[in-house]
């Protein structure tokens, strides 16, 4: 429901976005998933099942989960995916011991991961639309290039999307691609 509302708004505003999808949700909502691709949005993989303990148990478990999501996206949405986003971001408390190996193996296969440098902070808790917009403004920090994290499953995010877009007239909103230099958290294993 929220994703369809977001897609309606993006279509009305002629804006393309990037959706990092969860394979489990693609299987549960195939028509909405197909619509994302059919309307020209960039599709990336988030995961298949959003379970940090399972995902980050090992590099193999992460890649197995990714492959299942990838196969689902290819089968249902009809797109080949090259972008992915780590659940919790590339640097989090769950993946410290496996992140480096995951990144190396995924990059060897030609995948690119994106993190974010601004956020609605909508992943946890029930927030009102105005709070989400304030979070976006506070975390954008007048950067020239912003990758804003938002979650389509959150009702307030869908409800405030038009106002959120209007709050940033100075930005050209466009989807992530393989040609854009990715925003990535500092690779803690690199100096």
Residue ranges and their predicted role:
Residues 33-36, 58-61, 129-132, 187-191:
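Short low-complexity, flexible loop/linker segments enriched in glycine and/or proline
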Residues 80-82, 145-146:
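Residue-level recognition of the N-termini of beta-strands and the immediately preceding loop/turn
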Residues 4-18, 75, 117, 130-131, ...:
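Terminal accessory/targeting
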Residues 5, 51-77, 90-144, 159-160:
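Alpha-helical scaffold elements lining the catalytic groove of polysaccharide deacetylases
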Residues 42, 112, 172-174:
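Conserved beta-strand segments of alpha/beta enzyme cores
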Residues 1, 26-30, 123-126, 155-158:
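Loop/helix-junction capping segments adjacent to catalytic residues or to phosphate/diphosphate-binding pockets
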Residues 19-24, 45-47, 85-88, 117-118, ...:
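A cross-domain feature marking catalytic cores of carbohydrate-active enzymes
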Residues 1-80, 163, 167, 180-181:
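Active-site beta->alpha N-cap acidic-glycine motif
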